[in-house]
UniProtKB/Swiss-Prot annotation:
Glycosylated residue positions: 71, 153, 273, 284, 292, 305
Cellular location(s): Cell membrane
Pfam families given in the database record: I-set, Ig_3
Protein name: Neuronal growth regulator 1
Organism: Gallus gallus
Length: 352
């Protein structure tokens, strides 16, 4: 509403006539019907965006001496006398007949009915303009980032203002970008780890671009080991076992050979832990390093493990490794040559 104050100039008789005429035309405080009752009225309603300039058109008839603008029952202008203290309002006069009201930087408080009254030779004639101020959507409240355990029920809230009232929609920002039904509240029942991530709330009313805000949902779950794999090992060489895991919070990894916990930096063992994997390296492999290795992953929600044997090379299945294999080959060659010599010797005896 435009703030008002009584002007210092103008004819009191003219103002009295205007108010009296309005009282007669608007019994019991009711407003005149939209559309006015004199020619030259451009429109009976005006829609503008908040912050824009509104021009409420009104024109004087031939023979009309004065005009007045009122906001509900309060006078804004009487003729050229300004009764409002609001610096945003003025009279727009593109020609001698125009008597339009201009409001700069309109706000929602300016919303409502305005009446233009024109003094003719006989009686005041009026026209009403209803000003509607549209407001861009604005999200004023959204759920904070949350951390929940897998299987919990989650409710996200997004509240927005605007005129017209904005519609609210949600979507999960993921490779599938799954949309949800519109509404201020988004309910997720029995949330899973795949439903973790950012959720986007969008408020839209076609006045301007949608207002968008995001909330992050973190889903805790117990660790899982997805892969346990080793590289080939040889005596005197290096061996590597890789343990791939997942969990939120990130799991803590430990290693065991048999029942014994392994410590990085001891007995040629090096362990490097990352958020989703652990690497165990064995330097200068000896027979003592062979055995069953277990990777353990744990966080506050649980623990899991997986085991893998670290065995000698495939030749070890015959009990032959390293220098022994060379000796065995030499011995086998000697036996073979000896057998051939014996055969030739027997053949000569028979022939002779």
């Amino acid at each position: 509403m435009v703030p008002l104050v009584r002007g210092a100039g103008g004819s009191h008789q003219w103002l009295a006539a205007v108010l009296l005429g309005l009282c007669c035309l608007l019994p019991a405080g009711r407003l005149a019907a939209p559309g006015g009752d004199f020619p030259g009225a451009a429109a009976d309603s005006l829609v503008v965006r908040k912050g824009d300039t509104a021009v409420l058109r009104c024109y004087l008839e031939d023979g009309a001496s004065k005009g007045a603008w009122l906001n509900r029952s309060s006078i804004i202008f009487a003729g050229s006398d300004k009764w409002s203290v609001d610096p945003r309002v003025s009279i727009a006069t593109a020609n001698r007949r125009e008597y339009s009201l201009q409001i700069q930087d309109v706000d929602v408080t300016d919303d409502g009915p305005y009446t233009c009254s024109v003094q003719t030779q006989h009686t005041p004639r009026t026209m009403q303009v209803h000003l509607t101020v549209q407001v861009s959507p604005k999200i004023f409240r959204i759920s904070s980032d949350i951390v929940v355990n897998e299987g919990s029920n989650v409710t996200l809230v997004c509240l927005a203002t605007g005129k017209p009232e904005p519609s609210i929609s949600w979507r999960h920002i993921s490779p599938s970008a799954k949309p949800f039904e519109s509404g201020q509240y988004l309910d997720i029942y029995g949330i899973t780890r795949d439903q973790a991530g950012e959720y986007e709330c969008s408020a839209e009313n076609d006045v301007s671009v949608p207002d968008v805000k995001k909330v992050k949902v973190t889903v805790n779950f117990a660790p899982t080991i997805q892969e346990l794999k080793s590289s080939g090992v040889m005596l005197g060489g290096n061996g590597l076992i890789r343990c791939e895991g997942a969990g939120v919070p990130a799991p803590v990894f430990e290693w065991y050979r048999g029942e014994r916990k392994l410590i990085s930096g001891q007995q040629g063992i090096t362990i490097k832990n990352y958020s989703t994997r652990s690497l165990l390296t064995v330097t200068n492999v000896t027979e003592e390093h062979f055995g069953n290795y277990t990777c353990v992953a744990a966080n506050k929600l649980g623990m899991t493990n997986a085991s893998l044997p670290l065995n000698p090379p495939s030749t070890a299945q015959y009990g032959i490794t390293g220098d022994a294999e060379v000796l065995f080959s030499c011995w086998y060659l000697v036996l073979t040559l000896s057998s051939l010599t014996s055969i030739f010797y027997l053949k000569n005896i028979i022939l002779h």
